[in-house]
Amino acid sequence: MLDKTRLRIAMQKSGRLSDESQELLSRCGIKINLQQQRLIAFAENMPIDILRVRDDDIPGLVMDGVVDLGIIGENVLEEELLNRRAQGDDPRYFTLRRLDFGGCRLSLAAPLDAEYTGPQCLQDTRIATSYPHILKQYLDKQGVRFKSCLLNGSVEVAPRAGLADAICDLVSTGATLEANGLREVEVIYRSKACLIQRDGEMSVDKQQLIDRLMTRIQGVIQARESKYIMMHAPSERLDEIITLLPGAERPTILPLAGDKSRVAMHMVSSETLFWETMEKLKALGASSILVLPIEKMME
């Protein structure tokens, strides 16, 4: 029996989203042993319980108030939301924030030899998918009539097996589609992982813990997207150098011992520093340019 005074977070039991969710929690300083194949894990240093479940169960656990938070792909969340609305329910939850991992796209794919000039080509066809509600929402807007063939796996084999004329499935590189004689013809939904919270009253202690967690998540994401830059630069070219680094905060300027014409610059940049930018910095007289990753960050 779970202690209801502890914060309950649902996450994918296994898979890419599970690995990235574990990394996020770890970088937030939450110590949890997730190596053992247990459905429930307990944080050592915070009143947090982790429920490890199938990803398509997570939206329902949050919407039904079984857990407080869930880390889930937007595609799975949207499918469950549309499913419940189709049944006359009014699902309630909050999206706390979009995360910086779990990116994917849901696409229509047709046989390589099929002519495709737009969604209207799918009129009166049979389409295999694991996302019937997202597919219906998209094709209804296009005015396309179709029949849905619900499959929970191996969707890409449906056309060859004679089950469907086309498919709607998650795509990464497209290699699996090509191996099954298919090609991606239309992206209908783009998704990333997100953190969602149940509706309803939350205890003061839980809400304070969620606020702390959100601050840490924000810091982790900012750190991933930022770099710490150090260099020596000529004093008379500082404005030009700063212009080359959009998104950078105002730099810290330090004098160099024995060289009054140059300074040391330290700054945090939210922009990716490409080789071309570094070459331009060097052309302006910068030297000893270091670009370092940031582990943690808090504004």
Curated annotation (Swiss-Prot):
Stored PROSITE patterns: ATP_P_PHORIBOSYLTR (PS01316)
Compartments (UniProt record): Cytoplasm
SUPFAM superfamilies named among the record's database cross-references: GlnB-like (SSF54913), Periplasmic binding protein-like II (SSF53850)
Keyword annotations of the record: Amino-acid biosynthesis, ATP-binding, Cytoplasm, Glycosyltransferase, Histidine biosynthesis, Magnesium, Metal-binding, Nucleotide-binding, Transferase
Cofactor: Mg(2+)
Chain segments annotated as coiled-coil in the UniProt record: none
Main localization, broad class: cytoplasm
Entry GO terms, CC: cytoplasm
Associated pathway: Amino-acid biosynthesis; L-histidine biosynthesis; L-histidine from 5-phospho-alpha-D-ribose 1-diphosphate: step 1/9
InterPro entries according to UniProt: ATP-PRT_HisG_long (IPR020621), ATP_PRibTrfase_cat (IPR013820), ATP_PRibTrfase_CS (IPR018198), ATP_PRibTrfase_HisG (IPR001348), HisG_C (IPR013115), N-reg_PII-like_a/b (IPR011322), N-reg_PII/ATP_PRibTrfase_C (IPR015867)
Activation and inhibition: Feedback inhibited by histidine.
Name of the top EC class for this enzyme: transferase
GO MF, one annotated term: ATP binding
Documented EC number(s): 2.4.2.17
Reaction catalysis annotation: 1-(5-phospho-beta-D-ribosyl)-ATP + diphosphate = 5-phospho-alpha-D-ribose 1-diphosphate + ATP
Any one Gene Ontology BP term: L-histidine biosynthetic process
Functional note: Catalyzes the condensation of ATP and 5-phosphoribose 1-diphosphate to form N'-(5'-phosphoribosyl)-ATP (PR-ATP). Has a crucial role in the pathway because the rate of histidine biosynthesis seems to be controlled primarily by regulation of HisG enzymatic activity.
Family designation: Belongs to the ATP phosphoribosyltransferase family. Long subfamily.
Subunit field text: Equilibrium between an active dimeric form, an inactive hexameric form and higher aggregates. Interconversion between the various forms is largely reversible and is influenced by the natural substrates and inhibitors of the enzyme.
Name of this chain's protein: ATP phosphoribosyltransferase
Organism per entry: Yersinia pestis
Gene: hisG
